[in-house]
């Protein structure tokens, strides 16, 4: 089992902001998962991978594709109070689910 987290590169987040947004995406997608899925994922070491996408359009394409496959997602919208000037979609968590 694996969780995938996609991060927008066009936002040019600093390392601290990026790290927090990735954590939010992981937690949100996990909280949207079933207890059995979470248990199985934990038993297998909670594998995750962070990948980059170019922009919001590409992120939304992956969101649509993931949902069409029945995968659990967690879309993160930053509140826009520190790094960004307004609410901004930053990351997408997908899964955990089977690696295929």
Language model segments and positions:
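Glycine- and Gly-Pro-enriched alpha-helical subdomains that act as flexible
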Residues: 2-33
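Short basic, glycine-rich beta-strand/loop surfaces that mediate nucleic-acid
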Residues: 4-6, 44-54, 68-100
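Generic, ordered loop/turn and secondary-structure boundary motif
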Residues: 12, 39-42, 84-85
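Generic "edge-of-domain/loop-turn" microfeature
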Residues: 12, 56-58, 99
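Short, well-ordered secondary-structure micro-motifs
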Residues: 16-18, 62, 86
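Short, solvent-exposed amphipathic alpha-helical segments in soluble enzyme
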Residues: 21-23, 64-68
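Compact, glycine-rich, soluble single-domain proteins
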Residues: 23, 28-57
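Alpha/propeptide regions of enzymes that mature by internal proteolysis
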Residues: 58-64, 71
């Amino acid at each position: 089992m694996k969780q995938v987290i996609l991060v927008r590169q066009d936002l040019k987040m600093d390392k601290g902001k990026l790290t927090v947004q990735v954590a939010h995406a992981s937690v949100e997608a996990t909280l949207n998962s079933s207890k059995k899925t979470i248990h199985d994922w934990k038993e297998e070491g909670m594998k995750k991978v962070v990948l980059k996408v170019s922009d919001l359009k590409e992120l939304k394409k992956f969101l649509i594709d993931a949902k069409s496959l029945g995968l659990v997602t967690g879309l993160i919208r930053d509140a826009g109070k520190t790094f960004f000037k307004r609410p901004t979609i930053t990351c997408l968590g997908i899964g955990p689910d089977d690696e295929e």
